[in-house]
Amino acid sequence: MHPLELINKYCPEEKLRHILMLHSRAVADKALSIARNHAELGADETFIEEAALLHDIGIVCVDAPAISCYGTEPYIKHGVLGAEILRREGLERHALVCERHTGTGLTLQQIIAQGLPLPQREMQPVSIEEQIICFADKFFSKTKLDTEKTVEQARRSLEKFGAEGLAKFDAWCERFL
C-alpha cells in the first residue's frame, strides 16, 4: 500500500491530514537530500521516502489539540502507536522508524528514569535509513509547517533529551551535513 493511502485511511480529518502531510513531506525531502548527498552510505531512498511519510502516523491517536490531534493518548506515545498501526499493515521496517524517531531515540534507561508511558525497551534508530529520517525530523515542527529549523534551533529543541541526545545529534551533523 502506498504511504498516502495509509495516511488517508488512518487520518480522515482534513486539517490533521494537512499538518501530517506537510510535516512528513518536509522530513522526507530533507532525508532524501541527505541520502543523495551521501551515496557512500548506501541508503535505500525508496524506503526513506515511504518511512518518512509515515513516521508520524501515530499522531492520529494522541491528544495534542494545538496540531488538531484529538485522540486520548499522550503525545510521547505517537511513535509506538504509529508502529502498531504499521505493524498491522505488515510494514515492520517502517514501524521501526516510527518507534525510534523520538528525540534522537530513547534508551531503556531514559524510559525508566523518566517514567515514560512507553514499552520498556531500547528505541533508538539503528539502520542508516532510521538515523537519516530521525535526524531530518529534528529540523521540522508540526506547529511551524513552513519553517526549517537551523542546526542551533534543532539542538535547542533536543536539550530536554539530555547530553547523550545532543551528542548523537552533533555526530549526525558531522556525518550528514
Regions found by a protein language model. Give the residues of each.
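Amphipathic alpha-helical segments within well-ordered protein domains
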Residues: 7-8, 28, 32, 82-87, ...
